């Protein structure tokens, strides 16, 4: 029977949830959720000087926005330090690690001499095979005994087989002289203890895999499945940085991108399923696999992100979309909508969501429904309200006051009125938009009338006719 899949996301709490980290978390989440497995969260907070509670919270908030729920309790790597140290002592007792008394000055002198002579700077400790009786009463580190012959093969699900000669591996430090464990050891022990079966992470960790395999093998533990995914680059092909724009997941939340669209885009960033660009969360969970991840760095493309976000907004249920739009206003520091405005936003949703790519665009398109009387037209719309058009609106309004308020009937009334004026409805649209919304670019006049209702529509037309 195949063991259940267990993946993990293991960020360091030294800043916000980077867009690359968000994608790594998403890939792990999709792989586990699509296979009925577990997705675990570990905070790698061993660097006490740089780790902060605020950064941890920012990571959690970013994951919550993206809907990446984790199983079980959050694991703190720092809290497991005693366990990591105990494992190092196990290896020492088993003869698979040793005490090294070399000082930093001695190691630095060795490397300087090696560079000067054109030799490898890989440090070979003279203490590896030293008898215990020769050990001085001095500070020491614990080093693993790296294999000195043969090869280590990283069987990676994305990069393929990566072979490293064992004579290129050093006797890595496991425990510092102050008794604290190093990151390499902590990661292996935590992944083992958490039951992680698949390690999906950035390919900047690929070289670490060979060193971590030394620890797995020395302990007789099963090595997890490796999947080292390519990094994200900017549109210019260079590593993603601030010059390319926003880097943090929450920055995109504050800018008003829908979480579903961001999930879809991040999933497609380096992974593909045929020619499918737009897909639902359920489809992503079903389709996601490691075989579909490419080796080359993916390029972040804001236009593609916006396109997918627009499709997700258009496909969303109106009630859910209204809730998301209001949540966006809260996180971006904007005033909450009144109960009346919230109701009107919900009514307008059907006619504004088709072309909005972000929540600011969506709310802007709902301006006609959210604004209060009297409607003040902007400069461009005001040009449509000259004396002639005001007179036309004044004449039109009585014909609407007792009308049956359905689209077909409203279209018939306005087209007949335009015909009576020996013109086309298009000529009336400008003044009507200005009167109803105060703008020249709006949803269709008929949609605005249906959303506003007969009383508000006629009141706005009367206001504009004065």
From Swiss-Prot:
Q: Which CDD domains match?
A: GluRS_core
Q: Which SUPFAM superfamilies did the record assign?
A: An anticodon-binding domain of class I aminoacyl-tRNA synthetases, Nucleotidylyl transferase
The protein's UniProt keywords, in alphabetical order, are: Aminoacyl-tRNA synthetase, ATP-binding, Cytoplasm, Ligase, Nucleotide-binding, Protein biosynthesis
Enzyme class, broadest EC rank: ligase
Q: One short Pfam family name for this protein?
A: Anticodon_2
Q: What is its EC number?
A: 6.1.1.17
Binding-site residues for ATP, renumbered to this chain: 242
Motif 'HIGH' region, per the record, lies over: 11-21
State whether keyword Aminoacyl-tRNA synthetase applies: yes
By its UniProt entry, which InterPro entries does this protein fall under?
A: aa-tRNA-synth_I_cd-bd, aa-tRNA-synth_I_codon-bd_sub2, aa-tRNA-synth_I_CS, aa_tRNA-synth_I_cd-bd_sf, Glu-tRNA-ligase_bac/mito, Glu/Gln-tRNA-synth, Glu/Gln-tRNA-synth_Ib_cat-dom, GluQ/Sye
Q: Which family does it belong to?
A: Belongs to the class-I aminoacyl-tRNA synthetase family. Glutamate--tRNA ligase type 1 subfamily.
Q: State its role.
A: Catalyzes the attachment of glutamate to tRNA(Glu) in a two-step reaction: glutamate is first activated by ATP to form Glu-AMP and then transferred to the acceptor end of tRNA(Glu).
Q: What's this protein's name?
A: Glutamate--tRNA ligase 2
List the lineage, top down: Bacteria, Pseudomonadati, Pseudomonadota, Alphaproteobacteria, Rhodobacterales
